Amino acid sequence: MTATSAAELLDYDDVVARFEPVMGMEVHVELSTATKMFCGCANAFGAEPNTQVCPVCLGLPGSLPVLNQQAVESAIRIGLALNCEIVPWCRFARKNYFYPDQPKNYQISQYDEPIAINGYLDVPLDDGSTWRVEIERAHMEEDTGKLTHLGSDTGRIAGATNSLADYNRAGVPLIEIVTRPIEGAGVKAPEIARAYVTALRDLLRALGVSDVRMDQGSMRCDANLSLKPIGQAEFGTRTETKNVNSLKSVEVAVRYEMRRQAAVLTSGGQVHQETRHFHEDGYTSPGRSKETAEDYRYFPEPDLEPVAPDAEFVEHLRQSLPELPWLRRNRIQQEWGISDEVMRDLVNNGAIDLVAATVEQGASSEAARAWWGNFLVQKANESGVELDALPITPAQVAAVVKLVDDGKLSNKLARQVVEGVLAGEGEPAQVMADRGLEVVRDDSALQAAVDEALAANPGIVEKIRGGKVQAAGAIVGAVMKATKGQADAARVRELVLAACS
């Protein structure tokens, strides 16, 4: 850890004893439309650089934007799901600034007239309580291009010798969701920040408007934070930690920034209004001075008509909303018969939708929970990715469960099959065959292994014959070891007892 070292940070308990944090979350969500916001270029992740561009998204003279209707519908659906008021009239504005990722030198966004306002999202916390986060606005805008900086130790523009611009992302439809100041969180502030982004991600995924892949940048979180002495009404100076790209990092970034700002204030210093970069080893570093609205010189976009959603159409979209996550969880919890604690663990691990999808593919809820809530969570943590970013699908997990249920795999062998799927070796049945992992059930092969184990352990044989049936476990263990775990343990036990009778 560099920047403010760990030794210089104020202890977290001291921070919350002396200061009240005030947070504001800004989440940018790329919409899963077929084309970009204002042109017909493809909206697809991972294409070769600068192959999904045209005069509109490159800002060439004479090009004119045409609004993507699907993006507007997605924005309205998001607003409705967030309990927002959908305004009867809104319009776009030009946000003017100069930076290499913006070929037009302005971004088409919404400034003082967003499409959705005054909403809220009830967020479940780890202790079973709920925190209501108030939504100030949700507005439409276009994304910027992506810059790759070369020659810099940090991968950022400072110290770079060259910068490469990929404009495939320029013009991709975005929804920015902005909260009102979150006050009174106290010691729970970092948890609430993470829980809010988690709940928002789950909601957007349920709506089907975005794949919300934080690791790919389709959901990006900016965390605004200030501290004020307890009892003071006036807010402190805020910082904005940009582009925090995982749920865990949101919590870590807020906690670090609280401790850093507290250390600055208690030493007599001043917190500067600035953007800050989050580093994966858990600290933030200064970015640039934070601009104000005046710096961007907003004015109405002259090339686009205002958007006036028809009330009947808005109501149609409201009625077509899918089952929302909190309603779905209540239903699932009752159907599966699981406790509040188990449900919270599944939600916090990001496993609930994956478990449900695995059950829909034919697995039992118990087996699906065991895989996604334990073994695969461990694999995700080892890989440093979100659970849904692992290269395995609910259908593949369900296929592994079926192989176990059919007696073709033991639980131990099944873990090896899943590891093979994660390594890209193919479907579960193929991995099982290629690795030779299928359970051995042929009596002749098993009998030979049993006879060998019995011959090597005459003392245990005498114990079994003397009535100590539990001693058969040692022979079963020897057979399992000899067959590398592939023997059918239940059948081996039957053969052992039969041989010793």
Swiss-Prot record:
GO terms for molecular function: asparaginyl-tRNA synthase (glutamine-hydrolyzing) activity; ATP binding; glutaminyl-tRNA synthase (glutamine-hydrolyzing) activity. The keyword Protein biosynthesis applies. Its EC number is 6.3.5.-. It is an enzyme of class 6 (ligase). The keyword Protein biosynthesis applies. It comes from the Bacteria. GO terms for biological process: glutaminyl-tRNAGln biosynthesis via transamidation; translation. InterPro entries: Asn/Gln-tRNA_amidoTrfase_suB/E, Asn/Gln-tRNA_Trfase_suB/E_cat, Asn/Gln_amidotransferase, Asn/Gln_tRNA_amidoTrase-B-like, GatB, GatB_Yqey_C_2, Gln-tRNA_amidoTrfase_suB_CS, Gln_synth/guanido_kin_cat_dom. It holds the Pfam family GatB_N. Keywords: ATP-binding, Ligase, Nucleotide-binding, Protein biosynthesis. It catalyses: L-glutamyl-tRNA(Gln) + L-glutamine + ATP + H2O = L-glutaminyl-tRNA(Gln) + L-glutamate + ADP + phosphate + H(+); L-aspartyl-tRNA(Asn) + L-glutamine + ATP + H2O = L-asparaginyl-tRNA(Asn) + L-glutamate + ADP + phosphate + 2 H(+). Coiled coil: none annotated. Allows the formation of correctly charged Asn-tRNA(Asn) or Gln-tRNA(Gln) through the transamidation of misacylated Asp-tRNA(Asn) or Glu-tRNA(Gln) in organisms which lack either or both of asparaginyl-tRNA or glutaminyl-tRNA synthetases. The reaction takes place in the presence of glutamine and ATP through an activated phospho-Asp-tRNA(Asn) or phospho-Glu-tRNA(Gln). Heterotrimer of A, B and C subunits. Belongs to the GatB/GatE family. GatB subfamily. This is Aspartyl/glutamyl-tRNA(Asn/Gln) amidotransferase subunit B. It comes from Mycobacterium sp. (strain KMS). The gene is gatB.
